[in-house]
Amino acid sequence: MKKILLITIIIAILMCACVNKNDDNNKEQPPKAPEVEEIDPLKEQIEKMSIDEKIGQLVMVGLDGYELDDSALDMIDKYKVGGFILFKRNIQSAAQTLELINSLKEANEENKIPLFIAVDEEGGSVSRMPEEFIKLPTSRAVGKVNSEEFAFEIGNVIGEQIKSLGFNMNFAPVLDI
């Protein structure tokens, strides 16, 4: 009896082993395309920079006067600063401001990363824009109107004004407490 039971178990195991399963695991998978590592050009550019260049990119400086001077050139050439912020003391007219910003960008052409050229243009009493530009209401006055569309349009006007001079960063709006 034991012999028959043992033979039956062996036959059952062999029969189960011979069954052809038709599931997804047995299907032949199409060959996968080789994975191509995506190259991030920004990461690649940063890896090529020296430590001094990386540190310089963290610094934004102001400058004196209405024109590019030796001190500003030194900041660009020697220290590879990340950008400049212009204040009212740097802005006389639209033409002069455009000339200053273009000369900063031109002086930076040899560097790997373009400069941030910033301004703090909030509207109202905090305005750095030349006299030729539209004077805009304060953020408080814009808020009192209580209109998202109006606030959006004021923001667009500020953006277009500073963009027309070559600025690429604005430190506004802010919430002063």
Where are these regions (language model features)?
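Positively charged n-region of N-terminal signal peptides that target proteins for export
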Residues: 1-4, 8-9
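Enzymes and membrane/adaptor proteins characterized by extended Gly/Ser/Thr/Asp/Glu-rich
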Residues: 75-177
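Structural motif corresponding to alpha-helix initiation and N-cap regions
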Residues: 39, 69-70, 98
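C-terminal motif of bacterial Sec signal peptides marking the signal peptidase cleavage site
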Residues: 14-17
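N-terminal, intrinsically disordered, polar/charged segments of Gram-positive cell-envelope systems
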Residues: 20-49, 54-56
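Domain-core and long-helix interface of multi-subunit machines
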Residues: 61-62, 67, 72
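C-terminal non-catalytic regions of proteins with extracellular/luminal or membrane-system context
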Residues: 2, 19-20
